[in-house]
Amino acid sequence: MENFHIRMGEPVVPATKFCHDADRGLLFGKAFDCRIGCAAMLEALHRLEGKELPCDVVAVLSSQEEVGHRGSQVAVHNVKPDIAIVMEGCPADDTFTEPYAIQTALKKGPMFRHMDVSVICAPRYQRWALDLAAKLGIPVQESVREGGGNNAATIQSTLSGAPAIVAGVPVRYAHSTDCISTEFDFEATVQMVIALLENIDADVIRSF
């Protein structure tokens, strides 16, 4: 590394360009966990612009989720949320995994995880969200992950804690320089988050 004048600890930026295959509805790029989640959040906010909602919405782009959910902890201290929707790019299993073991696949909608190593998502909130998706005909997937972690862990355990769920856009080869996602899953995630925000009010929050 010294021959290339690269010091330990210096950042590396993969030379990957975003690419869109409109014919197949595929999205290609780097760091979709969590760029694709951030993009879905921004698109949902854009579509909700000017609309009256039953709740106040604060959107956060937090840093360092992969190394201890540090940014979300700072956000919780500043915002003090009553409830949270965590958006991310979640791993898709539909590559070399046996069909019976696939929990998350492309073109089947956002993934709502019940738990992973870091968190058990608020059960009543999770069930309410899944029932809402079924009522509105929005496709969603459910999973229980043996690894991983996300900002819901910090949100539910910082200060007084706030109920949290995770809406993940499925991503093949997450955490790599070349990720794959789909327009279908992106759009379904945006629609689901909009539906949640249009239906969350004080009574709903108290029920969790």
Regions found by a protein language model. Give the residues of each.
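N-terminal hydrophobic/helix-forming segments and targeting peptides
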Residues: 1-208
